[in-house]
Amino acid sequence: MHLRWLKQELKRTNEELEQIVQESPIWREKAALLRSVPGVGPTLSVTLLAELPELEHLNRKQLAALVGVAPVNRDSGTLRGIRTIWGGRSGVRTVLYMATLCAVRFNSTIKAFYERLRAKGKPKKVALTACMRKLLTILGAMLRNRTPWQPQAAVIS
């Protein structure tokens, strides 16, 4: 009984969020641009619109730092420490992680980038974090330029 109620509430909340996005011409346009990318669905697009309104105004380094997908080094003198990610907007990072898992499977650009990093010997989560950063950079550029997804235009670097 309780699980059914939770599912109904989740469905109702998602429908309300979608209605809010559709009522605003600006958000509707941005959501359509974001959703043109394979692996990006309603959850990520609504999360980015609501929790990261500065997405189209920041450069890639600023975006990565703001979301918390930029590696922070722990070096001291000649000692090379580990690189970790922390801080940033955890809600955006969590949703971006799940979307990147889909993108690695269904988005040819992100998939090729991930496979190249894995072939270089990078651990899976390190490669996935790099893909999160790349996906975020692509989404920011698409909103900034008001262009839909073009797989041939996404340079793999």
Question: Where do the protein language model's features map onto the residues?
Answer:
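A detector of single, family-specific signature residues
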Residues: 1-157
